[in-house]
Amino acid sequence: MPFFSICIPQHNRTSFLIEACRQLKLQTCQDFEICISDDCSTDGRGEELQQFLRESQIAFVYRRQERNRRYDGNLRAAIGLASGEYCILMGNDDCLADDTTLESLLGILINHPQTGVAITNFKDFASGEITRRMVRTGNLGSGPQVAVRSFRNVSFVSGVIFRRDRAQAHATDRWDGSEMYQMYVASRIVAEGYDLLELDMVAVRKDMTIPGEAVDSYGNRPRLNPCPIVERKTTLLQLGALVSDAVRPFAGKQLVWYEVQILLQVLFFTYPFCILNARRVQSWKFAAGNCLGMRPKNLFSQMDLPLLHRWLLGSIFFAVTCAALVMPLSLFDAWQPKLFAISKSILQRT
């Protein structure tokens, strides 16, 4: 049984995945397997990928899905193929940061045997800009409070590490369509009592570049024109209920308080960023439609919150919405690094 299973949900982008696998072959630690779930790729290169892996003598498991399962189901399927002690989740256009990444992670995880989830940092492949979602190295502990405090740190999937047996034990299709399956699993593992290990190390280079190849991105999508202001329910709407569901069996009488903390983080940090980003890549009207989709009657629909809590959170929603719709984008761009640092410092103190 290998120590690591590199779990990759695959759909097209085969050139990027082959390059990522080529770099895996260079790792000083070879105690790993690659687990690829192909979500009905249409580029016809599945056999080419497998042939490359065979010729490279890399241990791998490859399975093509019979139907398109989209992101959540495909990630769950990739984890389901794993047999290692730990699963390292990777996007199919991301790669490990350097040749000693697995060796470093192996030593750390052996010294922390109660780890259920580990989170690492990442940097941009082209620019080298580092995103420090973890600002120190250490054991954050376990339990529902730790899960509630940390769930936003796994929104980017690459470089998130799960204890394999627990990730497979918590497999569910309840949140298919949320595009945050890793967030549910991470929160559930930590809430049930396994440690969350934060690692201030860059383990991943994201968004690989290959000459003559390109990948689709949200920022490159054409603008809607005309763009009416109509309610648009995004995956963000499910975030609070998803994390609540993950911690619920272990929350006891504190569930409402945990749900309030979850929604406060969504409303103060995740939601305004999404609205401002929608204004940047689409339009003000498009962003306003997203705001309508997040209105309190939708946001609270899967939570049994007391009336007072709904009123207070609804008031916060209204204030944040107004701020996100009127703030100059130039001001947000200038303040974004500082706001990111503030959000991290707040969570470190809680």
Region annotations inferred by a language model:
Residues 32-40, 63-65, 91:
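Short beta-strand/loop segment that forms part of the nucleotide-sugar
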Residues 12-26:
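Short, well-formed alpha-helical segments that are part of the catalytic scaffolds
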Residues 179, 184-187, 191, 201-350:
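C-terminal subregions of glycosyltransferases and related glycan-biosynthesis enzymes
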Residues 100-133:
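Conserved donor NDP-sugar-binding/catalytic core segment of glycosyltransferases
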Residues 87:
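Short aromatic/hydrophobic "clamp" motif used to bind/position activated sugar donors
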Residues 65-82:
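Glycine-rich, basic loop-to-helix element that forms the pyrophosphate-binding segment
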Residues 120, 138-227:
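Conserved nucleotide-sugar donor-binding catalytic segment
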Residues 38-47, 67, 95:
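A conserved acidic beta->alpha catalytic loop
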